[in-house]
Amino acid sequence: MNGKQKILIADDSEINRALLMEILGDGYEYLEAENGVRAVELLREHTDIALVLLDIMMPQMDGFDVLKVMRCYSWLDEIPVIMISAAKDTANIERAYDLGVADYMRRPFERVMVLRQVQNVLMLYAKQKRLT
């Protein structure tokens, strides 16, 4: 083990996945999923995922359906999710929070916001785990 926290980036756009990895830098280990089905497969295979960056609109299974699977298996109790979308629709934002996301990130990405949101969510979940 390299000691780096593992982040699953689930987005059907290879460019968006690469951009997020470039913004976040070498301090993390990354897993990539191009659709929701692959995201669920990776969640089953890797029990040490620290964070999921999850796009809403993906083929085969969208981000909302991934969240439903995560709730079904109680993975949301252990793994925080930051939902990603270009949509400004508040209904999607509310639905994401209702399904259990820790935070919501809009595209286009702002470098400082991406870094801070990821750091804050990881820090808060680490503190929560220490308290339980």
Could you tell me what each predicted segment is?
Residues 2, 6, 13-32, 44:
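Two-component/phosphorelay signaling modules centered on CheY-like receiver
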Residues 4, 47-50, 74-80:
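His-Asp phosphorelay/catalytic-motif detector in bacterial-type signaling
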Residues 32-51:
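Acidic, metal-coordinating helix/loop segments flanking the phosphotransfer/catalytic sites
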Residues 58-61:
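Receiver (REC) domain active-site loop signature in two-component systems and cognate sites
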Residues 91, 109-118, 122:
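C-terminal output helix
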